[in-house]
Curated annotation (Swiss-Prot):
It catalyses: UDP-N-acetyl-alpha-D-muramate + L-alanine + ATP = UDP-N-acetyl-alpha-D-muramoyl-L-alanine + ADP + phosphate + H(+). GO terms for molecular function: ATP binding; UDP-N-acetylmuramate-L-alanine ligase activity. Keywords: ATP-binding, Cell cycle, Cell division, Cell shape, Cell wall biogenesis/degradation, Cytoplasm, Ligase, Nucleotide-binding, Peptidoglycan synthesis. It comes from the Bacteria. The keyword Transferase does not apply. Its main location: cytoplasm. One of its GO terms (cellular component) is cytoplasm. Belongs to the MurCDEF family. ATP binds at residues 114-120. Its EC number is 6.3.2.8. Cell wall formation. This is UDP-N-acetylmuramate--L-alanine ligase. It comes from Chlorobium limicola (strain DSM 245 / NBRC 103803 / 6330).
Amino acid sequence: MELGKTRRIHIVGIGGAGMSAIAELLLKSGFDVSGSDLQTGEVTDKLAEHGAIIYRGHSAGHIEGCDVVVYSSAVRKDENVEISAAEKAGIPVIKRDEMLGELMRYKYGICISGTHGKTTTTAMIATMLMESGESPTVMIGGVSDYLGGSTVVGEGKYMVIESDEYDRAFLKLTPTIALVNSLESEHMDTYGTLEELKNAFIAFADKVPFYGRVICCVDWPEIRKIIPMLNRRYTTFGIEEHADVMASDIVMEKNHTVFTITAFGSRYEGVRLHVPGRHNVLNALAAFSAGIELEIAPEKLIAGLGCYSGMRRRFQIRYDNGRGLMIVDDYAHHPSEVKATVSAAKNGWADSRIIAVFQPHLFSRTLEFADEYGWALSRADSVIIAEVYPSREKAENFSGVNGNLVAEAVRRAGGKHVEYIEGRETLSGSLREHCSDGNMLLFMGAGDITHMASGLAEELRNGSVT
């Protein structure tokens, strides 16, 4: 593997999951790698064992002798002394995704994009490949117990990458298979309009070479609109719309889903998933479609899907007392994701009382999607709304925007038991009161609500909640 005359590569933020995986791949490819991070630990120690030079903290001297500097999205470019020093010295400074795109040129790239379902579909494809005897390189934006984390640096030709549309990052990648799992309004701070977002996905599909393939879900109206604009071969999949790869006879019970796949005229019955929800059937169809393009035997693909055991924070059951009291933790933060997660709970656990505990993520998203959240949450038996998790935003820039906007929207949509609770301690106390047999507390959000879910589960395990 060569990157021109590049020999030494310095990585700012090397301890992050995505950056450490790139560092490991570069080391295995024979490059000299150095990197810095504010914190060091097990991940950076492992890289050091492989030959990386690791610096704790940032200093202009760390870039001395390097040919290129790579930085992650978590690093503020205009505030980092190493990046500033590199720019002054005329050393190229690039984002993680550009380096990843260059590395993909030496592999068979399988890139999974879409507004929703990226993480799960990427993990499903990785599981299928590994169960089929392949050794792929995998980078996922979540943690898989099957994979032993979020990244795998394999020896084989396949590179399976979760490809984020935020900040147009996925346009730096070089896929042979480009998978578009879903498409609707999101990241308007990057795109401004839905049309611009669709144009970005078309450009992503155009990154595929003439011998590659685009795989897309026709159950999404906006994807159906862009299909006539695709300039590459494509495969369609779906449940509701006619497609090349379809699912039928879907039966859901608790954490198990059984269905039939019909692919290009062939029928495969008894496909089993150990995760709930119609949305995961669509994710499985996406993975199966990719496997068919790779000419892997359908029987191996189905067996691989059966080995998929889920992702952390994707309907992760953190506690189950065997009498119906459950704590479930999910990353859902877009209305469609929330709707799919609540539906999975209601369909799979029909006898349970579903208590949705939702933490809105970003003030801008709360303002834009309040009504949609209302409809998505209204099917739950009871709804508790927490304060907005601000992430990169500041409350003073969004006067009057809070979780109560969502609570009111749930009531308008027909929700009967709805609370907006301010303050972490008050929320914790209310949640403890709901810990009764037959109740599923379904925590959803991309913020720190996950810590409340794990904390409550731990309290239940050690008997401190009665």
